Amino acid sequence: YLARTGHQVSVLDRQPAAGLETSFANGGQISVSHAEPWANPQTPLRALAWMRREDSPLLFRLRCDAALFDWLLRFLRECTPRRTRANVQQIVSLALYSRRQLQALRAEVPLAYDQLERGILHLYTDRREFAAAAAAAAVMREYGCERRPLSVDESIAIEPALAPARSLLVGADYTAADESGDAHRFTQQMARHCAAAGVVFHYGATVSSLRASGGRLQGVLAGGELHQADVYVAALGSFTPLLLRPLGLRLPVYPAKGYSATVPLAADSVAPTVSLIDDAHKIVFSRLGQRLRIAGTAEFNGYDTALNEVRCQALIGRARQLFPELRPAGESEFWAGLRPATPSNVPLIGRSPIANLYLNTGHG
C-alpha cells in the first residue's frame, strides 16, 4: 500500500527469504472468533494446575528472567473481568478490520495459499467450559463477531470428520466468516507482489543496532551497512523489545513458543476441512490441501526454539483421539516458533515515543 501511494519502501529481513520465522508453520487461521485473551479470570488457577504437566496447553518455565517476571505481573493484572472484556473488544475490532482488508486484497491480487473460507469451529469437551464460552461468545457478538453455539449434532453436520469423536464432545461454537490458509505461502506470495510494486527486500540483513538522536531515528545498521529513511517500522516479532531497549523503550512483548505438526494425508484419510479449535487443549487444526496442520500450546521459555518431544507428540495424540481414521501419507513435520505475546494479547500498532518510529508487534 505504501509503494502504491508513491513511497519508496525497503524491508530488512535476516532470513534468506520471506516468511521463514513466525509465519513458517503456524496454525494457519484467520480467526476473529479466537478473540478471548489468554489473560482472563479463569487462567491463573488453570496455569497453576498445568505447571507440573510437560504437555500442558500453557507452560511457564520459571527462570531467572526479569523480562518474564515483569510480563507475568502485567499478565495477572489483565486477568480481571473488566480488563478481559476491554481486551476482547479491542481484539475483535482489529480482527474484523484485518479480515475485511484480507478479503479486499484477495479481490485485487491473485493469491493461492490453500485458503478455505469454511469458518472455524471451537470444540468443547467440558460442560462448564462450554457454558463459559457461551458467555464469551455473547460478548463477541456484541462487538460484531458472529460466533454462535451449536449442539454436537450441528457441529458434526458442519464437520463430518468429527463423527468418531461424538462421545468426547459437549458442544461447539461456530463462526462461518472465519478462514484458514498457509501463512508461509501467503507471505511468500505477498513478498513477490510487493517486489513487483517496487518494494526493495534486503534478505540476509540482520539488524544489529539503531542510530537515534534528537528524539528521532537516524538509521538502521544491518550487515555492516547503514540504512536511512524518513520513517521506520519495527516489525521484528518477539525480537522487537531486544532491539528497542537500548533506545529506552521497554515493550511488554515476550516470546511464547508454539508448536506445530504438519501431517501429509493419504487419499483415504478422514480429516477435517473446516478449521477447528480444541479449547481444552489449546490446539488448532487447519486443512492445507492434502496436509493437516495441527498447532498450538504456548511455552514461555525465553528465546529457545528447540523441539520438546513430549509437546510434539501431544499434538499427534490429540489428533488421533479426535480423528481415528486420520491416515498419514508420510512422516509428520514438527516445528516450533516464537509468537510475540503481550500480556493482554492486544498488539502494539502505531507511533512510538520516538518521532519517526512506528511499532507493529505483539500479535502473538
Q: How would you name each of these model-derived features?
A:
Residues 3-24:
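Glycine-rich FAD pyrophosphate-binding loop
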Residues 9, 147, 232:
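Hydrophobic anchor at the start of a short beta-strand
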Residues 18-21, 212, 218-272, 308:
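Central helical "cap/lid" subdomain
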Residues 25-93, 113:
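Glycine-rich active-site loop/strand segments that organize a redox cofactor
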Residues 69-192:
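Rossmann-like flavin
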Residues 147, 279-280, 304, 320-364:
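C-terminal catalytic lobe of FAD-dependent flavoproteins
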Residues 150-159, 179, 200-218:
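A conserved short coil-to-beta-strand element within the FAD-binding core of flavoproteins
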Residues 243-246, 250, 266-269, 289-293, ...:
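Flavin-binding catalytic cores
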